Amino acid sequence: MIQIVKSSELEKDWFSGRTFTGTNEVVQSVIEDVIQNGDKALHLYGEKFDVSSPKDFLIPESELKAAAENLKKHSPDVYDAICYSHELAYKFALKQKDSFDDFEVELTPGMFTGQNTIPVEKAGVYVPAGRFPLVSTVVMTVTPAVAAGVKEIVLCTPPRVHPEDKAAAEKAGTGIPGKPFTGGKPYADEGIMAAAYICGVKKCYACGGSQAVAAMAYGTESIPAVDVIVGPGNKFVAAAKKMVFGKVGIDMVAGPTEVFIIADSSADPAWVAADLLAQAEHDVVAQPVMATDDELFARKVSDEIEKQLVLLSTAQTARASIDSCGKIIVCNSLKEAAEIANKKAPEHLELAMKEGSERDDIQNIVCNYGSLFIGHYAAEVFGDYAAGLNHTLPTSGAARYTGGLSVRMFLKTVTTLRAQNGSEGMKKSAAAAGFLGDAEGLAAHANAARIRL
């Protein structure tokens, strides 16, 4: 059962960012192996960790198209949902891109300073496919790259046994964890392949884990090196992204998912419980939290969690999360709840409150969150799937200093300078640069400025 505590009982450690250790040495070894041995290393780790280790890694575009057509035929509702999600995400990303204006301004006579926004040339996307192949993650990671104007998008996702190889795999007793089918055709989860095609991916590789991150960072014979890598993954993928940062850009090092709900007594306990469980089912260490100033409401939500939980197919995972990481905080006021939320800096923050001045006040107080969901009808799962927002968000307190994945990740803001010979501004800048070069003891700097006078 979820723990109910008073705000005064919260321990300092609860506000600390959560870290998961024990991966660095293993992942560093994988990265070094991929750098030295390329595709050979990828095959080795595929045989060690995956259900399939294909002969080649690149999935033909025709296979992606076939997966999309198959999804449209047999699951039209899911196909349409992916298309709708992609459409909204693309519109939102374009709106974000439009907010980054290019300009040139004459700050002083004859000195023109400017700003240009340029897309990166190559972007790598990692899409996990463990217990729950995350079709929506394809939309959230690929779409902003497309909107940014990235020329080449490389998507890596764990391999699956190709349909044409399944008979051979079954006969050999392979194609299962611990006994991979080797040498077959490259293939992946069909939903991920379909979503990749819908979103415009042309290069999809059947390669997963930290080895895929290393391959995208450094390049192999088959998988090209990229400029940035985005997308979620397990602790090994997260560690690999952290280690390759610097060689490439990364979106963030994300941990287990979180939701923090500030609820008043007008909220429906069933709705709040449903939102908490939607996070809890992700992972046994997911962190579902609610804060309220109404103790009776807190107990109603707790009871509703128990009613709904037993009906879930994901009950085992959700139960572990609720019992070990879940929390309902009874506060002295909703303002205090907002202050606690700011200190926690959650991935998702919901204001399950009736419309009015109090909700407006709380909305003005909260400032540390990945995404904010305002009011009873703005369900967090809408942001997960189909509202235009990106669901790749900062966790473990990182919302204190950064936002989520956006089109910005795939854009570089660079600056320019143009100077008119003999202008007043050029003379003043040259003189100032000369004096500052002298002050810092950098004679060549001073000379490079004064030589133009």
Predicted regions and their residues:
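N-terminal Rossmann-like NAD(P)+-binding subdomain of aldehyde/semialdehyde dehydrogenases
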Residues: M1-E121
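Short acidic-hydrophobic, aromatic-tinged amphipathic segments that line or gate anion-handling sites
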Residues: Q3-S8, K203-G208, I328-S333
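Conserved small-residue-rich beta-alpha loop and adjacent elements
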Residues: V105-E190
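Short internal beta-strands
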Residues: K151-R160, P288-E295, G375
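Conserved NAD(P)+-binding/catalytic subdomain of aldehyde/semialdehyde dehydrogenases
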Residues: T174, Y197-Q287
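A glycine- and small/hydrophobic-rich beta-loop-beta segment
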Residues: H282, M290-Y369
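C-terminal core of ALDH-fold dehydrogenases
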Residues: K343-L453
